[in-house]
Amino acid sequence: MAETSSLISGVAQRYAGSLFELALDANSVASVEKDLGRFEALLSGSEDLRRLISSPVFSSEDQLHAIGAIADKAGIKGLVGNFLRVVAQNRRLFALPGIIAAFRQIAAEHRGEISADVVSAHELTSAQQNELKATLKGVAGKDVTINVTVDPSILGGLIVKMGSRQIDTSLRTKLSSLKLALKEVG
């Protein structure tokens, strides 16, 4: 399993690096990041799209046509639209979530920022996001860009991943720890 994960990570890093270089040459890093975010939102909102990118059952041609149609309908054109088509043609759609995360990380490093992935049980308000950014800036010593995802299964609290560090204050983890402690006592 770890071998597969590192393979996907390697593929994602190479594709993200190539896309970043192209975006930098075209002076369009911000717009590429925005388009990737729009595609990521489509991906998180559609089980069928997630199945399309992860299933080997679909042919390269089917994936290429579907991704092209989805990108066109979503208004994702230019560099990102072409990039998605190349990824589909090369049968690397399974790596798209990793590619998007790697691109964000590379872009943040280029801006002198650090990127943090935040999982919350509920949608964070802009005031909460700003407070979290300020707190993380104090910890990291750099400006922090946060990518927030909502996962109700954590019940409450936050899970923050910043570089190689993870801070898990989720209620689910606290309940699991309490359950283990009670098993040891009883």
Curated annotation (Swiss-Prot):
Q: Does the keyword Protein biosynthesis apply?
A: no
Specify the domain of life of the species encoding this protein.
Bacteria
What membrane topology does the UniProt entry give?
Peripheral membrane protein
Q: Name one GO molecular function term.
A: proton-transporting ATP synthase activity, rotational mechanism
Localization (cell): Cell inner membrane
Gene Ontology cellular-component annotations: plasma membrane; proton-transporting ATP synthase complex
**Key words, A-Z:** ATP synthesis, Cell inner membrane, Cell membrane, CF(1), Hydrogen ion transport, Ion transport, Membrane, Transport
Name the SUPFAM superfamilies for this protein.
Answer: N-terminal domain of the delta subunit of the F1F0-ATP synthase (SSF47928)
HAMAP family according to UniProt: ATP_synth_delta_bact
Family indicated by similarity: Belongs to the ATPase delta chain family.
Record's subunit section = F-type ATPases have 2 components, F(1) - the catalytic core - and F(0) - the membrane proton channel. F(1) has five subunits: alpha(3), beta(3), gamma(1), delta(1), epsilon(1). F(0) has three main subunits: a(1), b(2) and c(10-14). The alpha and beta chains form an alternating ring which encloses part of the gamma chain. F(1) is attached to F(0) by a central stalk formed by the gamma and epsilon chains, while a peripheral stalk is formed by the delta and b chains.
Q: What does this protein do?
A: F(1)F(0) ATP synthase produces ATP from ADP in the presence of a proton or sodium gradient. F-type ATPases consist of two structural domains, F(1) containing the extramembraneous catalytic core and F(0) containing the membrane proton channel, linked together by a central stalk and a peripheral stalk. During catalysis, ATP synthesis in the catalytic domain of F(1) is coupled via a rotary mechanism of the central stalk subunits to proton translocation. This protein is part of the stalk that links CF(0) to CF(1). It either transmits conformational changes from CF(0) to CF(1) or is implicated in proton conduction.
Q: What is this protein called?
A: ATP synthase subunit delta
Species, as recorded = Brucella canis (strain ATCC 23365 / NCTC 10854 / RM-666)
The beginning of the lineage is: Bacteria, Pseudomonadati, Pseudomonadota, Alphaproteobacteria, Hyphomicrobiales
Q: What gene is it encoded by?
A: atpH
